[in-house]
A protein has these predicted regions:
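Acidic, polar-rich low-complexity tracts and alpha-helical solenoid repeat scaffolds
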Residues: 1-247
C-alpha cells in the first residue's frame, strides 16, 4: 500500500511558505525541493515566477554555482522585463565572483587557471551589464566596486604569468602578457609592473627604441592607489513581488 503524499492538497502558497521557512532556516536543499515542486505543479500561478527567482538564490546558497547560473539564466529568459532583473545580474556576478576569486593565491595548471580567469571575466561582465543598464539599482554601487577588484585580480594573473615567463627567459611571452595589462587593465594597480616587464623584455629582445619609449611612459606613470576591498559574498534573499503577501 502506497503512502499518501502529505503535500497532495497543498496550494502554491503552501509550498512557497514552506520553502521560505526552509530558506530562513538554512535548509537550502529542502527549499529547492519545495520551490521546484511548486513550479512543476503550478506553472501558471503567480508564486511560480517568484519560485524561479528563489531557486537561483537557493542554489547559490547551497554552493551549486552551475545550477544557480542556469536558474538565473532561465529566469531572465522567461521574464525579460521583470523588475528584479538587476538582482539576477547581481546574483550571477556574485556566483562567479565567489568561485573565481582566490585563483591567484597560488599556482594552478594552465588550463585550470585560464578557466578560472574566464569565470572572473563572466563575473565582471555581469556586474558591468548591471551597472550599465540599471545605474540606479541598489546593487549598482557594490557591483562597481567588485568590478574594480576584478580588474586588479585579472591584471595580477597576467603579471604572474609574465613573471613566470621572465624567469624562463621567454621574453616574448612575458612581453605579450605585460601588454595585456597595459592595454586591457590600464587603470589597474599592476600597470606599473607591466611596464617594467615590457622594458626588460624589449631590452632582452634587442629592441632598444621600444624599450626607451616604454621607459619614458613608465617614468611618467603615476602609481595607481590600491582600491581593494574585502568583500562579503553574502547575498540577501530575492526581493518579493509586491502584489502578494503570504503571511
Amino acid at each position: 500500500m502506497f503512502k499518501s503524499d502529505p503535500t497532495e492538497n497543498w496550494t502554491a502558497k503552501d509550498f512557497y511558505k514552506e520553502a521560505s521557512n526552509a530558506l530562513y532556516s538554512g535548509e537550502f536543499e529542502s527549499a529547492i525541493k519545495n520551490l521546484e515542486t511548486l513550479e512543476a505543479r503550478f506553472p501558471f500561478d503567480p508564486y511560480a515566477k517568484q519560485a524561479q527567482l528563489d531557486i537561483a538564490y537557493s542554489y547559490y546558497k547551497f554552493d551549486e554555482p552551475d545550477a544557480a547560473i542556469s536558474a538565473a539564466d532561465r529566469f531572465m529568459r522567461l521574464n525579460p522585463r521583470d523588475p528584479n532583473i538587476d538582482y539576477v545580474y547581481y546574483l550571477k556576478g556574485l556566483v562567479n565572483f565567489k568561485r573565481g576569486t582566490g585563483i591567484l593565491d597560488g599556482w594552478f595548471p594552465r588550463d585550470q587557471a585560464e578557466h578560472e580567469t574566464e569565470t572572473l571575466h563572466n563575473s565582471f561582465n555581469d556586474f558591468a551589464t548591471l551597472v550599465r543598464r540599471y545605474p540606479d539599482s541598489k546593487y549598482a554601487g557594490d557591483a562597481y566596486q567588485r568590478m574594480i577588484y576584478l580588474r586588479n585580480e585579472l591584471a595580477q594573473h597576467e603579471i604572474k604569468v609574465a613573471e613566470y615567463y621572465l624567469s624562463r627567459k621567454a621574453w616574448m611571452g612575458a612581453l605579450n602578457r605585460a601588454k595585456i595589462v597595459v592595454e586591457r587593465y590600464e587603470h589597474s594597480i599592476w600597470r606599473k609592473r607591466a611596464l617594467e616587464i615590457m622594458v626588460i623584455a624589449y631590452n632582452e629582445l634587442a629592441l632598444p627604441d621600444l624599450a626607451a619609449d616604454t621607459q619614458r611612459v613608465l617614468d611618467l606613470n603615476q602609481d595607481v592607489a590600491s582600491n581593494l576591498v574585502n568583500f562579503d559574498t553574502e547575498l540577501e534573499k530575492p526581493p518579493e513581488s509586491s502584489w502578494y503577501k503570504f503571511w
